[in-house]
């Protein structure tokens, strides 16, 4: 069984490592159900945390329904985060009918 900590800071990542977490889910703004963390925070955590890092890919507050602009922001975050060395992403995309948006999900997964 893998142990994952959801963290929003470098201090959280360091604590997760001290408690021997296998990976962290790095987010910002948990009060908004989690948003994409800043690139600076991702870089800091990557340099300090030795385990797997998965980041939340959610550029804005609101429903998990996205338009083309939001999807482009998400794709940009995936590319930039991969360059830093993250291990995975966490996201959710729905249609206007609250069903999984398979097309948009496939675009992110295939990157």
Regions found by a protein language model. Name each.
Residues 1-9, 57-75, 94:
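Active-site mouth loops of central-metabolism enzymes
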Residues 3, 15-22:
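A short, Lys/Arg-enriched amphipathic alpha-helix followed by its capping loop at the start of a domain
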Residues 3-5, 24-26, 53-57, 89-91:
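Hydrophobic faces of well-ordered beta-strands that scaffold small-molecule active sites
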Residues 10-14, 18, 30-51, 69-72, ...:
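Active-site-adjacent beta->alpha loops and helix N-cap segments on the catalytic face
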Residues 17, 82-83:
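Non-catalytic positions within long, well-ordered alpha-helices that form the structural scaffold/packing
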Residues 21, 50, 85-86:
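A structural motif
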Residues 39-44, 57-64, 87-95:
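Low-complexity, flexible helical/coil segments
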Residues 75-82:
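Extended substrate/RNA-proximal surfaces in nucleic-acid metabolism proteins
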